[in-house]
Every structure is written in structure tokens, then in C-alpha cells.
Amino acid sequence: MSASRFALPLLILAILAPTASVARAQTGNRVVNIAMEDQFRNRRETGVFRGDVVVLVYAERKGAEAALELGRRLHVLFHPTAETAPASEWSRQPVVGLPGWPASVRVPDVHVIPVACMPEVPKPLQTVARSRMRTDSPHVSVWLDFEGVMERTFGMVPGGPNVVVIDTNGRTHSVQSGHLDELEFKELAAAVNQIRIQSRPDIRTASQPATIRR
């Protein structure tokens, strides 16, 4: 599976950049609803995914390449059939199950959402940016942050990926910035799965922010 299916939207803004400094961020257990439009001018918001885990992978242009690769890896990890799916179906693949999950209960999905942060694009040129995004990403929705929402709400480290995890109740679980090594990637994936497990009706507990090296 080529990374381009996730990569193209963010590659529009990407340039090679040095490794970003690692940032540590601790968030409150607050409910959030991040809303913006995608390249098709469709309104998108995290609130509609209540009951699932949302992973927002965002970056400015210097961090776009690393962000796209991280997002692609996360999506394929939780949706393995995406590896061989056609481009038109890549983002619609079923989520991997959880051991011991009741057959009668819906398994929480994991929505890995690419966000292109472009506050520097002036309003008259935003139409051009949307058009280019539609051409390069006709199937995968890319949220376009022209207003600096992500940086204002969660902070952002330039030159690398930034990740926000939102739990099944719509609460900010964790925020991390900077390049992840293999162990950190596994810790992030484990934290997402733990949120999914905790949402099971018979064992539901408050989702606690994971201690992840950032």
C-alpha cells in the first residue's frame, strides 16, 4: 500500500525539515469538539465520532511529511485491510477487533484524521488550496485549518507531527508532538486500544491520560 493515499494531501504543503524538538503536553480531561471544513467544503467535527476514538494528526508545512507517514501507519495498524484496498475504499476499511469483545456490542472505531494547518494562506488563496487538495486527494477527507485552531487549542511543534487523541466520550486524552520512535509509536497505539477497551459497557471507567514520552 503506497503512503500516497494518505500522503498526497499533506505533501502539497510539505518540505523536508530537520527533526523537531520534542514537546511535552498534558491536557485536561475536557470535552472538545474540533470543527472545520475539508477540501470539499464539507463541515467536519470530532463530535460526530462520539463512541469512537479520534486521532488528529496535524502539522504545518515543515512537518507535513512526517505527519503523513505517522497517520498512514496508524490508520493501517487499526484498519489492516487498508494495506491492499483501492484508493476509493482506503478510509472505509473495518477496524480491527478487540480480544474478548462481546459479539453483540459494536467495536469502537479509530478515526485517524489528517489536518493540514495553513493559517499563513490568505483568504483569497484558500480556494486555490482547496482545489489543489481536491485534485490530489479525491477520496480521503483532509481537514483544512486556515484559522490556527489546532495550535491555539492544543499547541504545535513545527517540523514534525503533532497528535491529539480524543477518547470515546469526546474528551481530550493526550497530546504529543515530535517524531516518535518505534517504542513511542507502540505506546501510542496501546493507549488508543486501552481507550477502546475502557469503553466496553461492563468495564467502563474514566479514561485517564496516558503517560507517553513526548
Q: Where is each model-derived feature located?
A:
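N-terminal secretory signal peptides that target proteins for export/translocation
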Residues: 1-4
